[in-house]
Amino acid sequence: MSDHDRDFDVVVVGGGHNGLVAAAYLARAGLRVRLLERLAQTGGAAVSIQAFDGVEVALSRYSYLVSLLPSRIVADLGAPVRLARRPFSSYTPAPATAGRSGLLIGPTGEPRAAHLAAIGAAPDAHGFAAFYRRCRLVTARLWPTLIEPLRTREQARRDIVEYGGHEAAAAWQAMVDEPIGHAIAGAVANDLLRGVIATDALIGTFARMHEPSLMQNICFLYHLVGGGTGVWHVPIGGMGSVTSALATAAARHGAEIVTGADVFALDPDGTVRYHSDGSDGAEHLVRGRFVLVGVTPAVLASLLGEPVAALAPGAQVKVNMVVRRLPRLRDDSVTPQQAFAGTFHVNETWSQLDAAYSQAASGRLPDPLPCEAYCHSLTDPSILSARLRDAGAQTLTVFGLHTPHSVFGDTEGLAERLTAAVLASLNSVLAEPIQDVLWTDAQSKPCIETTTTLDLQRTLGMTGGNIFHGALSWPFADNDDPLDTPARQWGVATDHERIMLCGSGARRGGAVSGIGGHNAAMAVLACLASRRKSP
């Protein structure tokens, strides 16, 4: 192999959505880029698959909704990503009535008055609306900064307070300085309504609402900051359509994408060694002026031969299903189509969330398991074949909370136990067992699959099964953080000048956003520009 074949301006390790965004931006800028992906296809956790034999459904196996992908990234790269807004925000059956009443919230986030009354939350109507209005004073100003060089904490706060005054200052304090549980409890009194708000702080995050570490606050902020509004969208065609568009854009701009490339070693000088996926398993060596890494920080340390620091574990379970029809509800005031079009909260009241954390922290599977479901195919039936659409089939995705495999000791049979817990939780508020409406595959097996945190670690290399590659970070720097290099200014620095994070482990990198990839690419371009200016 010649030096030309080995030497690149940038080598990208990992072909998830962030790696694809980074590769596309840098190739678009005229740099020579090679992207290395261990699996047979790019996309990472943002992929669609046909999970069940003979059942033509493009299921989003891992990631499934989009809020944090800036339209500017899509436009810059010319990636035809299509997103659709869900017709309802959420429905929450009341556990106190075994699901015979519940709360339906429309697409603009306004609960229906009759439903508030039905769950005993009518006095909380104003507090609920005011809480989210105050949150938007923070998120509307923070959102554009996620694809700009980092502000310090004080700079971010000052901008928000200058924009929104005393009310914005109070909102900053509630969201950033104090446990978010205080603000939620102060805004509304109803147990169910508090839980509806609180779930956004606990997605993939093992914490209590009053946790002094504020890790729940950071998760909450990321779930509300997308677009400045926190609206979550359905990717048309499934999540795989998003990464397919990004991969096509990267290749069109000139990036070289190599799949089946299992990187086993990195060197701080930019040398990358990998095995090819083939019968010979040949070893390859390439060099980059820069190496952008989309794997977790723990995996990066291992590739460098450095000590691996402990990362926060993931805390979720995901269950995908195909059903013959949506299950019937016990609440006659809503239809299944309304209830499952948005987020269907199950056993996620404030008190249930706290009890579930306590049970999991003591090594017990929460009972009932807090979880939330949604039906992709109601908003986007294109993921179903014409035959399945005509038959009335639908998809259901269920996301369970407080289930880190690390706290349950023996993981033998954990997936089966988690599946049973998810189904039992769902059935506690349905008018019929969910098992009775499952579609069956070509082998007459029910169409249901479960992905645990252990599965994510094994299949995708996500350390601890953490969907954010570790604990999320605030989308701004601490006031005393050094911001003296482009990598630090963009939140992608490692201990090595040539190596930068471009995945979810980068600051501001979590969720399907492309922000980690964008910011790493901007850091590389800034480095090159500064070198050209140097005498």
Curated annotation (Swiss-Prot):
Tell me which InterPro entries the record gives: FAD/NAD-bd_sf
> What compartments host this protein?
Cell membrane
Segments traversing the membrane: 7-27, 509-529
State the annotated membrane topology for this chain: Multi-pass membrane protein
Q: Which GO terms describe its cellular component?
A: cytosol; plasma membrane
User: Keywords in UniProt for this one?
Assistant: Cell membrane, Membrane, Transmembrane, Transmembrane helix
Q: Does the keyword Iron apply?
A: no
- The protein's name is Uncharacterized protein Mb0921c
Which source organism does the UniProt entry give?
Mycobacterium bovis (strain ATCC BAA-935 / AF2122/97)
Organism ancestry? Bacteria, Bacillati, Actinomycetota, Actinomycetes, Mycobacteriales
